[in-house]
């Protein structure tokens, strides 16, 4: 049967019909001798013809040149398709490619060969996101901790100093690990510098912890008690979270003031950070003025995205405040429960000591010990409620205030642009009136002056439009990054919080199961 079949000539210009080869069993038995007698082709012959001809930039079926016999197609059928073939180059170079250094080639090539219905822009957009994620991962290779609070000085001149430790592999820093001492006003000074640089152009600057005059006064003049120790620990944890959020921002991380704060052993004294100073009063006045201006500005919002986001953040702010109040009440409830449990344990122990029945006395003593352990569990859970959940809500209430702040700056930018347009219109109207007036002796000089003013205000209008478009673009990007971080933070904290609850309940079960035999032993 194989002898009767003659292979068609390869130069007849017809594409290979693989349906005619289905019954050719002898094709496969002759491949070994064919391979031995034929030199290897410089180009891979294992590419299917339909894959090559599917692309308009690739060679036509008539241009596919096999070595000696078409049986070589099947002889190499077990080899993998080479993605480095020159015949594949037109497919990959038909469109401009973004920078794909961090991404392996298979992530870009494989989908385009196997799934022709997928459009190239989708692949490139997805690769760009992957590149950005990997780049962000490298940028955020930095760990910051705030520890060792230490009281420096005596009386009202005393202050708390904290050790800020940084571990990083970023080349922008001189060392991979370093630590410095910073006081609370240094943190406030850092935030003030960053806010003055980046807030008005649309960047969300994480807010620093708020001052507490009452709490710090207790630390300065009072003795070390539980309330002052708790206040210092709360502030230490808040400062640590503030720095961690700040260095996560790729733009803020590049700022020289932040690097100086983390590296420099000595910092210039931060000024204008006192709550009751003249600068503090001026800040309160400016906030009140901004609130009044916000009510008077009537912005015609043409972008539905900004209108929707502003409403979303308003609702989110209200719900977070309600939840924060509920969690604060829960923390107080657990502390009260802990105190009542401790009182119950003390009463049970006293009753056990006065009991004459041996088994009952022993059971009451064991019950008192269990209640003391449960009291400790309630205290630990109250701390978990506060440091895990309540502080997260408090941080995001302040962060949403910062988000609202960039929206307000966008409104101010629009108002500045709008004022420039109104002034330009008035200047043009004045020029038109001047042209109508019949005063040739004064018109030329005035015309030149008004023309210079018009050109100046035209430049201001163009600059205002560019500034408004730029801040809108920046805010869109910042809000997207903020939403990702918010979801990630809440997921992490909720999981840790639930794990702490589960651990507490499991420990409670162990305590009561261990006490149960003592109760049953009463006879």
UniProtKB/Swiss-Prot annotation:
Annotated organism of origin? Pongo abelii (Sumatran orangutan)
Q: Which Gene Ontology molecular function entries are recorded, alphabetically?
A: epidermal growth factor receptor binding; insulin receptor binding; leptin receptor binding; phosphatidylinositol binding; protein heterodimerization activity; protein homodimerization activity; transferrin receptor binding
Q: Which residues carry this modification: Phosphothreonine?
A: 101, 104
Keyword annotations: Acetylation, Cell projection, Endosome, Lipid-binding, Membrane, Phosphoprotein, Protein transport, Transport
Residues given in the record as a 1,2-diacyl-sn-glycero-3-phospho-(1D-myo-inositol-3-phosphate) binding sites? 183, 185, 211, 235
Under the heading InterPro entries, the entry gives:
AH/BAR_dom_sf, PX_dom, PX_dom_sf, SNX2_PX, Sorting_nexin_N, Vps5_C
Q: Which SMART domains match?
A: PX
Residue ranges of the region described as Membrane-binding amphipathic helix? 278-295
Q: What are the subcellular locations of this protein?
A: Early endosome membrane; Cell projection, Lamellipodium
What biological-process GO terms show up in the record? early endosome to Golgi transport; intracellular protein transport; lamellipodium morphogenesis; retrograde transport, endosome to Golgi
How the protein assembles, per its UniProt entry?
Predominantly forms heterodimers with BAR domain-containing sorting nexins SNX5, SNX6 and SNX32; can self-associate to form homodimers. The heterodimers are proposed to self-assemble into helical arrays on the membrane to stabilize and expand local membrane curvature underlying endosomal tubule formation.
Residues that bear N6-acetyllysine: 473
Start and end of every BAR domain?
Answer: 299-523
Q: Where is this region: Disordered?
A: 1-104
Q: Does the keyword Membrane apply?
A: yes
Protein's recorded name: Sorting nexin-2
User: Residue ranges under compositional bias (Low complexity)?
Assistant: 27-48, 93-104
């Amino acid at each position: 049967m194989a002898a009767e079949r003659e292979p068609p000539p390869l130069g007849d210009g017809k594409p290979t019909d693989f349906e005619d080869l289905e019954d050719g069993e002898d094709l496969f038995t002759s491949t070994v001798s064919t391979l031995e007698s034929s030199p290897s082709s410089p180009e891979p012959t294992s590419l299917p013809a339909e894959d090559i001809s599917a692309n308009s930039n690739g060679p036509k079926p008539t241009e596919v040149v096999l070595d000696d016999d078409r049986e070589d197609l099947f002889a190499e059928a077990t080899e993998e398709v080479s993605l480095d073939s020159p015949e594949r180059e037109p497919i990959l170079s038909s469109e401009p490619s973004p920078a794909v250094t961090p991404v392996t080639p298979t992530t870009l090539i494989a989908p385009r060969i196997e799934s022709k219905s997928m459009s190239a822009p989708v692949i490139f957009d997805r690769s760009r996101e992957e590149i950005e994620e990997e780049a962000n991962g490298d940028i955020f290779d930095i760990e910051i901790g705030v520890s060792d609070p230490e009281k420096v000085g005596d009386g009202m001149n005393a202050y708390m100093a904290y050790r800020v430790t940084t571990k990083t592999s970023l080349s922008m820093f001189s060392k991979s690990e370093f630590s410095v001492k910073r006081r609370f006003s240094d943190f406030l000074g850092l935030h003030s510098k960053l806010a003055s640089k980046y807030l008005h152009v649309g960047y969300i600057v994480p807010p620093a912890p708020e001052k507490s005059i009452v709490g710090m006064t207790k630390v300065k003049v009072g003795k070390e008690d539980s309330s002052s120790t708790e206040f210092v620990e709360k502030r230490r944890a808040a400062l640590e979270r503030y720095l961690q959020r700040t260095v996560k921002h790729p733009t803020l991380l590049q700022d020289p003031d932040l690097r100086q704060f983390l590296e420099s052993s000595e910092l210039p004294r931060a000024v204008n950070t006192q709550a009751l100073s003249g600068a503090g009063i001026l800040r309160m006045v400016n906030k009140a003025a901004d609130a009044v201006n916000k009510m008077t500005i009537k912005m015609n919002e043409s972008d539905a995205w900004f209108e929707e986001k502003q409403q979303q953040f308003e609702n989110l702010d209200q719900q977070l405040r309600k939840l924060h109040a509920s969690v604060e009440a829960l923390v107080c409830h657990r502390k009260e429960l802990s105190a009542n449990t401790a009182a119950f344990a003390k009463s049970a122990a006293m009753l056990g000591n006065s009991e004459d029945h041996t088994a009952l006395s022993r059971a009451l003593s064991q019950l008192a010990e269990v209640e003391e352990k449960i009291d400790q569990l309630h205290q630990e859970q109250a701390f978990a409620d506060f440091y895990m959940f309540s502080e997260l809500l408090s941080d995001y209430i302040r962060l949403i205030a910062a988000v609202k702040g960039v929206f307000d700056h966008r409104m101010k930018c629009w108002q500045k642009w709008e004022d420039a347009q109104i002034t330009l219109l008035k200047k043009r109207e004045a020029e038109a009136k001047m042209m109508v007036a019949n005063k040739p002796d004064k018109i030329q000089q005035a015309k030149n002056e008004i023309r210079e003013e018009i050109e100046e205000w035209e430049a201001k209008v163009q600059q205002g439009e560019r500034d408004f478009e730029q801040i809108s673009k920046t805010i869109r990007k910042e809000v997207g990054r903020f939403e990702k971080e918010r979801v990630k933070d809440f997921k992490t904290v909720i999981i840790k919080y639930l794990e702490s609850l589960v651990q507490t309940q499991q420990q409670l079960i162990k305590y009561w199961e261990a006490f149960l035999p003592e109760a049953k032993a009463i006879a």
